[in-house]
Amino acid sequence: MRLNVAVFFGALFGALGVLLFLVAFGSDYWLLATEVGRCSGEQNIENITFHHEGFFWRCWFSGVVEENNSNIWKFWYTNQPPSKNCTHAYLSPYPFMRGEHNSTSYDSAIIYRGFWAVLLLLGVVAALTASFLIICAAPFSSHFLYKAGGGSYIASGVLFSLVVILYVIWVQAVADMESYRALRMRDCWEFTPSILYGWSFFLAPAGVFFSLLAGLLFLVVGRHIQIHH
């Protein structure tokens, strides 16, 4: 009875972890950036460019917002314009764009971004592999498959933990926002970029928690089956 309860909760937590990982992987809201520029000299109107990016795409669109209004709601699906500009994020990580920075900065950004992308892909593969192993283990009560599935869940949790840490380092240290701001201020007498972590980013740590918990439960289940059968 206790074994069945552990398997049930392990499967539940594992499914939640995989779902959160897949949504974080497929959505383009790891980063929300707002560029506020006063280029026309008007005091009460701000020309704003909104950026959001994920693994696959980086998109941006323009808007005009009155002062004292919150800009974060502009990223909500229903508040976005019907058309916007998008480019492959792994080819142009924000704020680095080809032609706007020297080749050394751009190449370094691409290498860092590529390493982050590889870890993200490995995390997704590990989570899907873990789910497959657990599905195969259930009919046969195989302690080996339960342990392998649990280890894969733990591996996916560790990989996504590294993904989150690397992304924080990217935003806080690697992305040279000061140089980007200085470049844009050549055209606008006042330019202020603002960066926030998006909801896709926050889904990843939640997935890490459920994935690690599922992995530990399945390791315990596998150990229990090995001892008593």
UniProtKB/Swiss-Prot annotation:
InterPro entries: PMP22/EMP/MP20/Claudin (IPR004031), TMEM182 (IPR026763)
GO biological process, one term: negative regulation of myoblast fusion
Extracellular side: 27-114, 175-200
Coiled coil: none
Region annotated Interaction with ITGB1, chain positions: 49-59
Induction: Up-regulated during myoblast differentiation.
Membrane spanning residue stretches: 115-135, 154-174, 201-221
Tissues/organs with expression: Highly expressed in white adipose tissues (WAT), with 10-fold to 20-fold higher levels than in brown adipose tissue (BAT). Also expressed in skeletal muscle, heart and lung. Lower relative levels of expression in kidney, spleen, testis, brain and liver.
Residue intervals annotated with topology Cytoplasmic: 136-153, 222-229
Signal peptide: 1-26
Gene3D superfamilies: 1.20.140.150
Sorted UniProt keywords: Cell membrane, Glycoprotein, Membrane, Myogenesis, Signal, Transmembrane, Transmembrane helix
UniProt keyword Transmembrane present: yes
UniProt topology in membrane: Multi-pass membrane protein
Disrupted-gene phenotype: Mice exhibit significant increases in body weight, muscle mass, muscle fiber number, muscle fiber diameter and myotube formation and an acceleration of skeletal muscle regeneration.
Subcellular localization, as worded in the UniProt entry: Cell membrane
Glycan attachment positions: 47, 68, 85, 102
Job description of the protein: Negatively regulates myogenesis and skeletal muscle regeneration via its association with ITGB1. Modulates ITGB1 activation by decreasing ITGB1-LAMB1 interaction and inhibiting ITGB1-mediated intracellular signaling during myogenesis.
Subunit structure: Interacts with ITGB1.
UniProt cross-references to PANTHER family, sorted A to Z: TRANSMEMBRANE PROTEIN 182, TRANSMEMBRANE PROTEIN 182-RELATED
Protein name listed in UniProt: Transmembrane protein 182
Biological source species: Mus musculus (Mouse)
Gene: Tmem182
